[in-house]
Amino acid sequence: MDGAAGPGEGPAHETLQTLSQRLRVQEEEMELVKAALAEALRLLRLHGSTTTLQGSGISAPTRNSSITVPPGLPPTCSPSLVTRGTQTEEELEIVPSSGPPGLSNGPPALQGGSEEPSGTQSEGGCSSSSGAGSPGPPGILRPVQPLQRSDTPRRNSSSSSSPSERPRQKLSRKAASSANLLLRSGSTESRGNKDPLSSPGGPGSRRSNYNLEGISVKMFLRGRPITMYIPSGIRSLEELPSGPPPETLSLDWVYGYRGRDSRSNLFVLRSGEVVYFIACVVVLYRPGGGPGGPGGGGQRHYRGHTDCVRCLAVHPDGVRVASGQTAGVDKDGKPLQPVVHIWDSETLLKLQEIGLGAFERGVGALAFSAADQGAFLCVVDDSNEHMLSVWDCSRGVKLAEIKSTNDSVLAVGFSPRDSSCIVTSGKSHVHFWNWSGGTGAPGNGLLARKQGVFGKYKKPKFIPCFVFLPDGDILTGDSEGNILTWGRSVSDSKTPGRGGAKETYTIVAQAHAHEGSIFALCLRRDGTVLSGGGRDRRLVQWGPGLVALQEAEIPEHFGAVRAIAEGLGSELLVGTTKNALLRGDLAQGFSPVIQGHTDELWGLCTHPSQNRFLTCGHDRQLCLWDGEGHALAWSMDLKETGLCADFHPSGAVVVVGLNTGRWLVLDTETREIVSDVTDGNEQLSVVRYSPDGLYLAIGSHDNMIYIYSVSSCGTKSSRFGRCMGHSSFITHLDWSKDGNFIMSNSGDYEILYWDVAGGCKLLRNRYESRDREWATYTCVLGFHVYGVWPDGSDGTDINSLCRSHNERVVAVADDFCKVHLFQYPCARAKAPSRMYSGHGSHVTSVRFTHDDSYLVSLGGKDASIFQWRVLGAGSSGPAPATPSRTPSLSPASSLDV
């Protein structure tokens, strides 16, 4: 069984390993404390000698004089205590050099260990110290005043401390009493100098403040403080960039098609463009209509919706389009109501918004009337009663409404001969509605239902589709694979249309057409009918009397037929259940023009020298995409869920991390697996090659980073070591430019640094890493990017982050379906950004292509891939006017023409 523990690998063994590791860390801490105490005693003796000299009339060094730190003292003058890998503030206070009140970048000096006000925690969840005295020269130990009795009692007193914290408290007290140095300075005067924002907010807050001495910035996520040290080259935060970046994004291409779980999703417009939808975007694709796409095709996008589009209908004029969206919530948790947009496909301008506040959950099906040039629109929502309503298209006024059925409604349509006849079908039913209104007065229409009777024929579980024939009969396709012909009775056929008696339809013929359900029916211009099967994946053309004329089979890897649309001449467009859009005919077969994933996406990486990128996700497919040709280069079945990937700097191989702890190295040309390794049994969340290609880092949910040395352009690897110290699963990591160090984030908001070349050692003094340069910046926590976090963040609001290769902008993927663009570095709280909509689910990843010409973003549940063109300084083409920090795109600003 997967994940079963072998001998000696059970929970007891893991617990023993954890305890042993903790013991080793504590022993190291004791050595550090002993060394610090010895150095403190030596400095006290030096201080005593200085006092003696002063008493003898010899002048001692002043505060402004230059005194070097004794060689035994570390540059930061303070050991960092690290327990179980979590980050703990220094027990000895850091005091920088004197300077302007902005920032000071000299190395910190030692001070007595004062305590912060109640409620302030260190980065790892323990109490932290914070200096309150005036600044002094770097590296100088200065005495502090004894603690006054009137001060606030200790935060970690024995009465309120947990057993695990007491040894550390005793250790600190012992150090203070032995050296008489670590005295608490908690006077009212010193506390008055603290920033009032230094206390953390409540759960789910994101508050930040600057250390008064200018060494660090602290922000809070879920009440936990995260300390980030300011690089020495930054003298003042005021010199950092402010405002949104000059670069902007323009949606270039959308990969994918929503065929897995939707219907009424594929049509051909009068212009020849194919219209379909995915996520919140309605795509207008022109086969062969322009440079760049498969067969020279191009895309335009209607982006007026605020949540996922569920259905489409095309007006009889072939220009106007109606699209219905589902309900959702915005970033503040407020509900977004389902609505129908009627828009012009030539200008992409919204003409009418219908039903705001009238529908529940979402819009399930739409249809324009045909007999009166599309004057009316019928809508079925996704409420429990599946309300059927009729609307005046030009005025957006509801004319009639009625409860349809408690069962699912999958299709709706007007009779092309008579707008008073409406048909709905779905779970175990087909209903024929007579609309007695039609004068256009609001609410004057009545809808009367007559249920279809199956009689001697077996009643199917579902009737997913139907089509009207030129003679007025109706064909329905059902879950049994049958096509039923419904004809009107003789008396009703003589009845004039509007205002006459109810029309009665009965089954007059049945033909077994497919094995399994029939998902789509399409009436062709020559009067023949096409049917698309689910299980058998067959397309069949039917003549009069339901005689089969011709058929073709869709390849299995494309899935079953979901929708059929007739193109130019004999050309057909077919949408499939595996989110592919095929183009061809029954004689020559079909080839894909649009392809996509079918389940949640997480893994994304871009090629180091080409405009190509690779994706993987829960559908177990690994796909390499050509960003220039907007096409799928190749795909393969991983057999397991892929969660992360990265190209070797040579581009010859790519590594893919799976949800079982396995990782694969594949040749990008042959797709051959050249390496198959397993590290632990937890999922892998990040894989990253060093910039020189000599190391590979694997971040796992078992809290460890596995390091491998790499040779032969990535085809060979061997275990080099493990980075152990995080207290939660690894979420992000980056390599330094020299390939020797790693910065990593974890699930409990840690920022740790590792010396890989030195033996995968944890760098306990994080202050020393403040000036290190990073080859990539994908960690979501760090000084250079902390400004991207919104107020009130709970720590999960940002899923992915990527700095451009030119180090000018940062792209952010958030949990509210948005892609943001910030200036880099982004080290100001509440930094403004350019915000872009389109995804219908949390955005899981963003990456820039090798030359920063494109940005690729992944949707989670919507399985969409967006390719954005980066415009701005130095790029061709006008930059679209996108407001910064727009709460939601207005219809005008959301159109990408």
UniProtKB/Swiss-Prot annotation:
Cited InterPro entries: Beta-prop_EML-like_2nd, Beta-prop_EML_1st, HELP, Quinoprotein_ADH-like_sf, WD40/YVTN_repeat-like_dom_sf, WD40_repeat_dom_sf, WD40_rpt, WD_repeat_EMAP
Repeat in keyword set: yes
Post-translational modification: Phosphorylation at Thr-882 during mitosis is required for interaction with TUBG1, HAUS1, HAUS2, HAUS3, HAUS4, HAUS5, HAUS6, HAUS7 and HAUS8 and their recruitment to spindle microtubules.
Biased composition, class Polar residues, residue ranges: 51-68, 175-190, 883-897
Coiled coil regions in record: 16-43
GO biological process: cell division; mitotic metaphase chromosome alignment; regulation of mitotic spindle assembly
One Gene Ontology CC term in the entry: spindle
Extent of the WD repeats: 235-287, 296-345, 351-393, 399-435, 449-488, 505-544, 550-585, 590-627, 630-668, 675-710, 717-756, 766-824, 831-870
Superkingdom assignment: Eukaryota
Residue positions, PTM Phosphothreonine: T882
Positions of post-translational Phosphoserine modification: S177, S199, S205, S884
UniProt subcellular location: Cytoplasm, Cytoskeleton; Cytoplasm; Nucleus; Midbody
Modified residues (N-acetylmethionine): M1
UniProt keyword terms in alphabetical order: Acetylation, Cell cycle, Cell division, Coiled coil, Cytoplasm, Cytoskeleton, Microtubule, Mitosis, Nucleus, Phosphoprotein, Repeat, WD repeat
Biased composition (Low complexity): 96-108, 118-132, 155-164
Residue span of region Disordered: 51-210, 876-897
Purpose: Regulates mitotic spindle assembly, microtubule (MT)-kinetochore attachment and chromosome separation via recruitment of HAUS augmin-like complex and TUBG1 to the existing MTs and promoting MT-based MT nucleation. Required for proper alignnment of chromosomes during metaphase.
Subunit architecture: Homotrimer; self-association is mediated by the N-terminal coiled coil. Interacts with EML2 but not with EML1. Interacts (phosphorylated at Thr-882) with TUBG1, HAUS1, HAUS2, HAUS3, HAUS4, HAUS5, HAUS6, HAUS7 and HAUS8.
Family, as annotated: Belongs to the WD repeat EMAP family.
The name this protein goes by in its record: Echinoderm microtubule-associated protein-like 3
